[in-house]
Structures are given as structure tokens and as C-alpha cells.
Amino acid sequence: MAFNNKKKNANYISAKESRAIARENRKITQEIEKKRNRKHIPEEEYVTKMKNPENCVEFDNVQTYFFTDIGTVKSVDGVSFDVPQGKTVGIVGESGCGKSVTSLSLMQLVQRPSGQTVGGEIRFNTGDHVYNVVNTP
């Protein structure tokens, strides 16, 4: 039986691969931050309407990713649910399934620039206006 030393370890990436991933992820986060940090963002980009006016919060296909030096972590990928006005909602799930990142996305407390809510909508009803938190400056 011959032993093959040249077999790659599937859990290892080279320094060159890591640098390429980091470079690409920096480009992505810089583009998102550039859009987010614009001055005089028109209200049309973040003022919206609730799908159901009886809700105070609506998560619709929310995607929050972390762009690291070794790849992209899709912490929240396609989460959708509603929170009706006057109701208490609990989020239950296994360790590491994205419960905290989902709530941090609503509060705009995801650690930037590596963490970004890149897709979907989080509609928040203040009573006077409805904001899409994902696009709100």
C-alpha cells in the first residue's frame, strides 16, 4: 500500500487562499459601508409600509453575514417572521443558530464592518412611520 503525502487536508486553506478571501471580503464590506455611509440618503430608500399593519416588526428573508479572512459565515440566512403589536415573541433554537444575530440585526448592533445585514427587510413600525431597518442610516 502506497501512502500519498500530497493529499490535501479539507480543513486547511493556504495563506495565499486566505489572503485572496480576505481581499475579496474587504471589497464586499467596503462597498456595503460606502453605500451605508452616504450623506443625505433619500427617505424612499428606508421608509416603507408594513405587509400587515397589525404587526410592530416584520422580518422578511433577512440575511446577516460575517465576512472573515477565511470565508463568509451566513449567520442568518433567510429568516422571516412577524411580531404582532402588543404580543411577546420568543426566539428558540439550538446554540449557534442565529437567535442573537437576528435580534442584533433589528437593533443595528451587528459588529461592522465584518458583520453586515446584506439582504431582506426588517420593517419596524414606530406608529408614525415604518422603517426598513436594513436600509436605515
Q: What are the language-model segments listed below?
A:
Residues 1-137:
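ABC transporter nucleotide-binding domains
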